[in-house]
């Protein structure tokens, strides 16, 4: 695997605490839209959009991971939107909701508004 580079513009490598970390509880959407993958270098569409501001990060999101929903029924894959090579997203994330028991994406139109998940995000 070839390494493209290290995010030196974002002060990486760095000790913990050099950049803001955020924990945010995010409610699911009332009507989920399945992810449609983008072309190479293009963000996917659909899913649940979460802004950098909703994560408490005023400038950008560099990394994010979800703990999954409160009842264990769902997990989430976090995508940078847009993904900027060697930089962060100045917009936010797209969340792809997955059913924990099968690993399949949640169907379109499913109401996830009663579910909450926690996201750890690092940014600036």
Task: Explain the meaning of each model-derived region.
Residues 1-49, 114, 118-124:
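Extracellular receptor-binding modules and their adjoining Ser/Thr/Gly/Asp/Asn-rich linkers
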Residues 36-112:
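Extracellular attachment/recognition segments
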């Amino acid at each position: 695997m070839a390494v493209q580079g290290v995010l030196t513009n974002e002060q990486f490598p760095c000790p913990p605490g050099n950049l803001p970390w955020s924990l945010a509880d995010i409610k699911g959407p009332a009507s989920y839209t399945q992810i449609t993958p983008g072309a190479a270098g293009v963000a996917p569409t659909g899913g649940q959009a979460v802004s950098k501001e909703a994560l408490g990060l005023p400038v950008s999101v560099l990394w994010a991971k979800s703990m999954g929903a409160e009842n264990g029924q769902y997990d989430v894959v976090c995508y940078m939107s847009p993904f900027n090579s060697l930089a962060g997203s100045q917009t936010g994330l797209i969340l792809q909701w997955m059913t924990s028991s099968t690993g399949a994406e949640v169907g379109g139109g499913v109401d996830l508004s009663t579910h909450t998940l926690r996201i750890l995000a690092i940014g600036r």
